[in-house]
Each structure stands twice: as structure tokens, then as C-alpha cells.
Design a protein with these regions (language model features):
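Flexible, glycine/small-residue-enriched loop-and-beta-strand segment within the central core
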Residues: 4, 15-151
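Beta-rich strand-turn-strand
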Residues: 147-157, 166
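Active-site-proximal glycine-rich helix-loop-beta segment
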Residues: 92, 161-162
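C-terminal segments of enzyme domains that contribute to small-molecule binding surfaces
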Residues: 1-6, 12, 104-148, 178-235
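Conserved G/P- and acidic residue-centered "switch" motifs that form tight phosphate/ATP-binding loops
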Residues: 159, 177
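Glycine-centered loop/turn positions within well-structured domains
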Residues: 104, 163, 167, 171-173, ...
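Catalytic-loop signature of eukaryotic-like protein kinases
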Residues: 138, 156, 173
Length: 235
């Protein structure tokens, strides 16, 4: 299977697997696009890894980001130095892992870590990306949300539109607001435990395809137990 790169795009030091597509006016450097992965118009990627069937819509800006299979983003997505799991649904105008400014120092200005202003000689005074930023699997992030550095969003969580996430989010928890606060759990604790145990997002694609009706059911303990059975058989 061949890949496609629009003639207007620049792709350097990058591996494209079969079926991957890079659309108009993109700039991709030192990255890897998995089988069937898509990158929309006017996107810029550097040191990124996209899993199988990952879909990045137009005007994305991504640096040192790893995205799992089947995860997709909306327009104007930005990410820095972060890891995003499988089967995530990320809406438009979402920002993940933006740099921190250390407000405990005399100044928060970027000349402490950027040579662009001509005031820094030598190495940056601190690493603005030192705190990890991790998004789990099957996470839904609504439009205009911001996930700050140092935050881990657990599997199955939901981040409401416009939320600013400054603290860790537990698995299968819905958060909203500025700053984001827990609203409720998506399911009862036993169903959540079973879904996490199942690791269904690691199942082979064909197994998921063959069981779409199961995955479309309302989540409860019985449905989760059936997912567990699939995982025990195929993982």
C-alpha cells in the first residue's frame, strides 16, 4: 500500500506507512505516520508519532507528540511534548501540554529559555517542558479545552468544552470549568474497574470491527464483562 504527499507539502526525515496521507501545505519533520494516518492542510509536525488511522485535521501545530491509533483531532489542535492514547476524540481549538512559565523567578519572560531575543548566552535557565503531560485512552476532549503541563487525564475521561485542566483527572470522570473540576463519574465503580481491566483499546482492529454492536451498547457490568471476555481471548 502506498502513501500520499501533496506536492505543496514538505516532509523530511519522516517515515510514512502504507495508506498515510499528507494534505496541502504541511510541514512535517522527523516524524512517523502509521498505516492510514492522515494530516490535514497547513499542519506542522515535528518529532511526532501518529498511530494507525490517527487523523489530524487542518491547521494543527504539534511538537514531540505521540498519538495512539484511531485518535482524531479537530481543526487548530496544538500539542507540545505530550503523549496521547488510543481511540481519543479531540475537538477543535484544543491545546495540550503548552509550556510553563516559572512565575517563582524574577521574570516570566521567554528570554530565560529562548535565544530569539538575543539576551540568553548558553543553555536555557530551565526546562519549560519538564513536567509530563499524558492523555489516556478513549478520552473525549471538547472544543476550546486546555490541558496544562504536569497533568494526567485518565482512561475514559471526558473534558468539557472550554475547560482548563490544571490537575489530574481520574479515569472515566467528567470534568468541566475553569479551573476544571469533577462533575461526575461516567459509570458505576464496578463497570469502570472492568473497562479499565479489559484494555479494549489494545484489541486487534478486526476484533473491534466484528463486535461493533457490543461496543455501541450502554455501558454496564454485563457489557463490560463481555468486553473482558474478548480481551482474555485476544490479548
Amino acid at each position: 500500500m502506498t502513501y500520499y504527499i501533496d506536492p505543496s507539502s514538505t516532509v523530511k526525515d519522516t517515515k510514512l506507512c502504507g495508506g498515510a496521507k499528507v494534505y496541502k501545505n504541511c510541514n512535517i519533520i522527523s516524524s512517523r505516520l502509521g498505516e492510514g494516518a492522515l494530516v490535514g492542510d497547513f499542519s506542522r509536525l515535528s518529532d511526532c508519532t501518529l498511530g494507525e488511522k490517527a487523523s489530524i485535521q487542518r491547521y494543527a501545530l504539534m511538537f514531540n507528540t505521540k498519538i495512539g491509533r484511531y485518535t482524531y483531532t479537530g481543526r487548530n489542535f496544538t500539542s507540545w511534548h505530550c503523549e496521547i492514547g488510543k481511540f481519543c476524540s479531540i475537538s477543535w481549538n484544543v491545546s495540550i501540554g503548552g509550556a510553563n512559565h516559572d512565575y517563582s523567578r524574577i521574570t516570566t519572560h521567554a528570554f530565560l529559555y529562548s535565544a530569539d531575543f538575543g539576551l540568553l548566552d548558553g543553555e536555557p535557565e530551565y526546562n519549560r517542558f519538564s513536567d509530563a503531560c499524558i492523555i489516556g485512552n478513549d478520552v473525549w476532549i471538547g472544543c476550546g479545552a486546555t490541558v496544562c503541563r504536569g497533568v494526567t487525564v485518565g482512561d475514559g475521561a471526558v473534558v468539557a468544552a472550554g475547560a482548563v485542566v490544571t490537575k489530574n483527572v481520574e479515569p472515566y470522570t467528567i470534568v468541566a470549568g475553569v479551573p476544571a473540576k469533577p462533575i461526575k463519574k461516567r459509570f458505576d465503580e464496578e463497570t469502570i474497574r472492568l473497562l479499565i481491566k479489559s484494555r479494549w483499546w489494545d484489541l486487534p482492529s478486526q476484533v473491534i470491527k466484528d463486535n461493533v454492536k457490543l461496543f455501541s451498547q450502554k455501558a454496564d457490568k454485563n457489557a463490560a464483562k463481555k468486553i473482558i471476555e474478548l480481551s482474555e481471548k485476544h490479548l
